[in-house]
Amino acid sequence: MRTLYPEITPYQQGSLKVDDRHTLYFEQCGNPHGKPVVMLHGGPGGGCNDKMRRFHDPAKYRIVLFDQRGSGRSTPHADLVDNTTWDLVADIERLRTHLGVDRWQVFGGSWGSTLALAYAADPSAAGHQLVLRGIFLLRRFELEWFYQEGASRLFPDAWEHYLNAIPPVERADLMSAFHRRLTSDDEATRLAAAKAWSVWEGATSFLHVDEDFVTGHEDAHFALAFARIENHYFVNGGFFEVEDQLLRDAHRIADIPGVIVHGRYDVVCPLQSAWDLHKAWPKAQLQISPASGHSAFEPENVDALVRATDGFA
C-alpha cells in the first residue's frame, strides 16, 4: 500500500493580492521545473496544511498550495465579503497567471472537489487533469444529511455537542440557526458556534475517530474561518445557478482525464455523489476505498490518491 511522500518544505512562499480586500497566501514545493499541480483545500475555510504537500512525487511535480479567501494565512481572516465560489475560481486563474503556469493538474477533496469541478467546467480555466476525493456536489440533500438529519444517526454522541449549540426552538433549520450566530456581532457567540460546527466535522471524518484531528478543529483561529466560510457558502447554495450545476455542466469536463477516490463509509460526503459524478463523467476512474471514511489521510484513500498522481506524473 502506498503512503504519503516524505515531508518537504516549500522552496517559495508568497502572497498575491487578488482584489482591493483579499490577499492570498501561497507556496510552491517539489521540483520548480516539474509538472504543475494546484492543491485545493477543503471547507471552504479549511486552509492548506503541510501534509497536503505529500500526495505527489516532489522530484516530478511542481506542487502549488494556497489558502482560499479568508482561510489559513490569507487575509482578512474568516472574511465573508466578496467570498463566493466564482471569486475562488477566478483566484485560481490569477494565481496560475502570477506563477507563469500554462496549465496544471487540479487536486482537491471534499469542498476542494467542488471547487475543482467548478473551475474545470469554466471555459477559460487551464485544468487538464483532475484528482478528486470525497466528492461534494453541494446539493441540498447532501447538506441536510450532514447538518440537519442523517449523519446524526451514525454519530449521536458527536451530534449532541453540535446540537446543544442551538436552542430547541431553532432546530428546525440548523444551518440558518448557526448562520445567525456565526455572523453575530458578539465575538464569544461567533466562537462558540464555530467550535461546535467545526468539531462536528472533525469527529466524523475518519472511520475510526482521530482524537488529534478533532482537537485541531477546536482551535479558535481554524474554527472561525472553517465554520463561518462553510456556513456562508452552504446557506447560499454554493452560489450556484441551480442546485445540480456541477452535474449539469459535467459535459464540459467530459474529455478531461481524472480519478475519483471516495471512501465507502464517508459520512461527511456520502458515496452517492461520487457515483452520480462518475455517471455524468464516465472518462474518470472511480475508486471506492472499501474500509475508509471521508479524510484524505485514511490509509486506503492515501494509497489510491498517490497511485493516481504517480499515474499522471
UniProtKB/Swiss-Prot annotation:
One GO MF term: aminopeptidase activity
Subcellular location, record wording: Cytoplasm
Reaction equations catalysed: Release of N-terminal proline from a peptide
One GO cellular component term: cytoplasm
Entry-linked SUPFAM superfamilies: alpha/beta-Hydrolases
Gene Ontology biological process terms, A to Z: proteolysis
Active site: 110, 266, 294
EC number(s) given by UniProt: 3.4.11.5
Keywords: Aminopeptidase, Cytoplasm, Hydrolase, Protease
Protein's UniProt keywords contain Cytoplasm: yes
EC class: hydrolase
Residue intervals of the AB hydrolase-1 domain: 35-298
Pfam families: Abhydrolase_1
Subunit relationships: Homooligomer.
Function: May be involved in proline metabolism and sensitivity to ascamycin. Has ascamycin dealanylating activity.
Protein family membership: Belongs to the peptidase S33 family.
Protein name, per record: Proline iminopeptidase
